[in-house]
């Protein structure tokens, strides 16, 4: 599943490519995603201009004029493909946004766990009301994290992945951030000291920022709208490195399951 860095890369690309473009029409080839596509999406968007593109958590928000927004979530395997001329449609091209200059944006999703909906301003505010803090903001620091973790008896990795507390830090970046901070994923969240919280907040920011600069991580499905792959996976310390030596100490990387998810860590470096 694309996590915060991948969605940020996509949002930045779309900001450069489709901001201020007028939508000529919207074609829906498959309405049956996990959450149904807004039924009158073509009527709502035809002739409208995209004023802004931004990200909230793992959602891409395209603000349309001043009254509404298109909300897109890529789910497990979704992609947004930007094309500058007509191309043959693929099997899983579910939604096609055609612009007045004949460029188009295609939502492709083999597993159909994605989301494409249109919301008015009030609906948009309510939709995002339960999401946690953005970890790349100035507000997210050691003090904030320490308060967030107080009295939380869950393991620290599961807390980092809780989007109601902190958005966008998925499995990959939780594992990598904890390694960089030298904190074991087995630790209870409430037991982290202020110094550890400060270090972890810094390393979450560093890990996410490094991943964005590298174009994200391409493991299976993820690609940028241009078709380019990300390459942050080449810089992983622990994720996917089971039975391989730690880059820091040569200890063998350990794989365990936490809350149904794979967790990779070095039990020598992380404590």
Curated annotation (Swiss-Prot):
Signal sequence extent: none
Positions annotated as zinc finger (FPG-type): 237-271
Cofactor(s) listed: Zn(2+)
Sites where the protein binds DNA: 92, 111, 152
GO molecular function: 8-oxo-7,8-dihydroguanine DNA N-glycosylase activity; class I DNA-(apurinic or apyrimidinic site) endonuclease activity; damaged DNA binding; zinc ion binding
Keywords attached to this entry: DNA damage, DNA repair, DNA-binding, Glycosidase, Hydrolase, Lyase, Metal-binding, Multifunctional enzyme, Zinc, Zinc-finger
Single Gene Ontology BP annotation: base-excision repair
Cofactor note: Binds 1 zinc ion per subunit.
Active site: 2-3, 58, 261
Domain of life where this protein originates: Bacteria
PROSITE patterns: FPG_CAT, ZF_FPG_1, ZF_FPG_2
SMART domains reported for this sequence: Fapy_DNA_glyco, H2TH
Documented EC number(s): 3.2.2.23, 4.2.99.18
CDD domains per record: EcFpg-like_N
Reaction catalysis annotation: Hydrolysis of DNA containing ring-opened 7-methylguanine residues, releasing 2,6-diamino-4-hydroxy-5-(N-methyl)formamidopyrimidine; 2'-deoxyribonucleotide-(2'-deoxyribose 5'-phosphate)-2'-deoxyribonucleotide-DNA = a 3'-end 2'-deoxyribonucleotide-(2,3-dehydro-2,3-deoxyribose 5'-phosphate)-DNA + a 5'-end 5'-phospho-2'-deoxyribonucleoside-DNA + H(+)
Similarity comment text for this entry: Belongs to the FPG family.
Record note on quaternary structure: Monomer.
Function comment: Involved in base excision repair of DNA damaged by oxidation or by mutagenic agents. Acts as a DNA glycosylase that recognizes and removes damaged bases. Has a preference for oxidized purines, such as 7,8-dihydro-8-oxoguanine (8-oxoG). Has AP (apurinic/apyrimidinic) lyase activity and introduces nicks in the DNA strand. Cleaves the DNA backbone by beta-delta elimination to generate a single-strand break at the site of the removed base with both 3'- and 5'-phosphates.
Protein name: Formamidopyrimidine-DNA glycosylase
Species: Wolbachia pipientis subsp. Culex pipiens (strain wPip)
Lineage: Bacteria, Pseudomonadati, Pseudomonadota, Alphaproteobacteria, Rickettsiales
